[in-house]
Each structure stands twice: as structure tokens, then as C-alpha cells.
UniProtKB/Swiss-Prot annotation:
Signal peptide: none annotated. It is found in: Plastid, Chloroplast. This is Maturase K. It comes from Calycanthus occidentalis (Spice bush). Keywords: Chloroplast, mRNA processing, Plastid, RNA-binding, tRNA processing. One of its GO terms (biological process) is tRNA processing. Transmembrane segments: none annotated. HAMAP family: MatK.
Amino acid sequence: MEELQGYLEIDGFRQHHFLYPLLLQEYIYALAHDHGLNGSILSEPMENLSHDNKSSSLIVKRLITRMHQQNHFIISVNDSNQKGFVGHNKNFHSQKISEGFAVIVEIPFSLQLVSSLEEKEIAKFHNSRSIHSIFPFFEDKLSHLNHVSDILIPYPIHLEILVQTLRCWIQDAPSLHLLRFFLHEYWNSNSLITPKKSISFFSKENQRLFLFLYNSHVYECESVFIFLRKQSSHLRSTSFGSFLERTHFYGKIEHLVVVLGNDFPKTLWLFKDPFVHYVRYQGKSILASRGTQFLIKKWKYHLVNFWQCHFYLWSQPDRIHLNQLCNHSFYFLGYLSSVQLNSSVVRSQMLENAFLMDTAIKKFETIVPIIPLIGSLAKAKFCNGSGHPISKPFRTDLSDSEILNRFGRICKNLSHYHSGSSKKQSLYRIKFILRLSCARTLSRKHKSTVRAFLKRLGSELLEEFLTEEEQVLSLIFPRTPSHRPHRERIWYLDIICINDLANHE
């Protein structure tokens, strides 16, 4: 990272913002390979990087040599005899360079992110990254709101929009041309499929580059919330991250202020209610408001028009659902969340008169949807479609302890992620399915019956599926007759990604 930062701080980069020369450096491809598709380029020092046979130094050197010798990327269609850069082993070379390019475009933002964290002294940055940190926010805010909107952020209708979005952040024209080449290369090779499937295919082949492009696209779509929030509050809000500090961003805000202030004086009034909250994970977002149905419909109208006019995105009406919180449950991050009205009867006595008061209290509830979760288990071959446990095929060379540990780890991960559920009955059923599926798998391996195997294994099978929170729950909460441990919710601040089995979307 010191070597990268040294290049970025030289006069040539500061004056011209050139990123493409980094494509000719071998360590870029080592970073792209060794840190994986989901890794961070800031997690390990340079000396810890290594190579394997597939991404050897010799292959990278040959690739760099071809880039030095090649004068252009795009080969003429009429000249079929040319063996240019993409003429020989095109897919492999394109994938390698796109992986390296993904690392390069992340560098300026990563350095700004590190500097902003050091300046703000954010010590609990990893806690704020946790998915579970969203649900305490829901508990605190949603019980006071009236309406909720489920929003699916639309995909860009053309890949050129992604390039135009990055023009505000990256002022290196050759790098933008190279990005445009990659996008059109994958688009042309999959021209017979829809744009959404094309983007999905692109994400599977070059996940790191796609995630960077998609996050930049989503951030642009969300820029309207930042602007409206700043206009509706006297205190200027400070957003986390380095994406706000980009070229022309504040210029755009000032321009929008002038336009809305002069031409649409009543528009900002619609958004001055401070009780509007917005939460997003991946491509799905939740917009909740305390206002009336009219206000939330105005939000929908302005969002659709903003996306269509500013980003040329066609947002279908069924991608934004408007519902009342008291009558609607929304699915988000593997939980089915809702706001329930719980009545509380209080007896009051004044002098000789006594009367009962029925008070309705709003409470935020989160439950685990059992049907989608059973569908995920059935897809992974732990049970059939009706939830009946079946034996899962494993390699014959695996020992009993390895099979037992794998089942136990899956069960603990699911229980760990869904520990915030208000009702634990669904989790008990999932654990029963996994436990019996494990017993069927082991009994099938030993050609025995499930009853005999469970009798022989005994408490060892039960302890393997017992989670840590169940072991310490009795120490945290007192044992009283009114205590109901199946309703206690526990949120963890170390979960930064959703479990594959828990993600039913």
C-alpha cells in the first residue's frame, strides 16, 4: 500500500490523475488475485502477497508485455487475421485486466476512506458495518412512523450510464475508455439476453469490478436523499465515507438549490418532515415516514421522476410498494418485520371510583419466515419441499466428526444470524431439520437406522447444535416464571454479510 500511495502522491498523478499506468505493474494483479473478489486491498501488507499456478508471475509478465506491444485494444471486425490483444485468449486476458482495473479504481477512494477515518477517529467502524445494527435503528424509529415503502432500485438501462457516473470521480480519460471497452465487450458477447441478465453475468465473471460500479450507481440514485435531507434540516448532515468528496458534487447541489428555490418553491415543503428514514441493503431499500398517505405518494412520484429524468432509469410502478405499517409486514435482510399494536390494560382508581384504561402500545416485531427458509434448506438438499429432513450426500472420505462439525456450523450460523427473532419457534424447527438431516446422513454412511444411531450418539449430537447464546442465555436473564427465553432478541455487531441460506430474495 505504501508503494501505491507513493505513486498516487507524485506530481504526475496529482496534475493529470492518471490511473492506467498501474495496469503495467505486476503487484496490481497480485492484489487482485490474493485478496479475492470480496477482499479489501487495505487488509494486508504488500509483502504478504503470493501467487499460485493460475495467476503466476510468468502469466502476468506475458500479459504486461502484450499490453506494451499492442497499440490498440479494439480489433477491426473485417480484419480477421489480426491477433491483437483480444484476439488470442480474449476472455482470460480481459478478465485479468478487469480484475486489476477494479483494484486500481478503488485506490483513490480507499485512501480517502482511511484518511477520513483517521481524522474522525472512528474507532467502532466495524460495528457500524454490521447488518444487525440496522434492526435496533428500526426498533427505535419505526414504532413512531405510519407508512413504509419497499423500494427496488432499478438497474441502469444502458451500461454507458455507469461510465458517465464515474466521470465525476475519475478524471483519467484512458481509464474511462478502458472501462467502456470492458463493458461493451461483455455486453456484445451476451447481446441476446436482457440487460439485467447481462449485468448478472458480468457480476459473476468480474464481481469486484461490478460491485464497485453498482455501488457508484446506487449512490447516485440515493443522492436525492442527501440533498433533500440537507435542505430539510438547519444542521448540515455529515455522511460517512469518501464518496461525498468528489468533483462537481457540491456544484450540483448549489445548482439544484437555485432551480428548486426559484422554479419549484413548494417542492421542498413536501420533504421537510424530519420523521423520514431511509435504509438500504444491496438493491432493496426501505423508506418510512410519519406523514400521511399523500406525503408518501409524493415521495414515490419524485423518486420515479428523479430516476427517469436524471439517470434515464425506467422504474416500474411495482418496484415501489406503499403500505401502512400497522397493516403490513415487510421482508428485509432475512427477517419479516412489522409494527404490532399490543394492548395494555391498566386499572386506575380515583377516590371511590375505579376504571380500566386500555392503552395501545406499538412494538417492533421481527420473525423468521419459515417457508422461505425451508425452501433454502430444500435447495441445499437438507430436506424436501415440505420440510421433511433427508440425508445430504457427502464425500465418503469425510469422517463422522467432520460431517458433524459441518452440520453444526451451519446450524450455529443460522441461529447466530436469526438471533434477533421475536419468536424462536421457527428456529427450533430449522435446528430440528438440520439435526435430523445430520443423523440421517451419518446413519446412511454407516448403513444403520436413524433410531440406533441417535441412541448411540446421544448427547454429543445435541451439544454440537447448541449455540453459544443458548448456553449463556440462562446467565444473562434470570430464571423467573414470567421469563420467556424464546422471545429474547439478541443483535450482534460482527455480522457484515447475510448468510446464503438466510437470503431468500
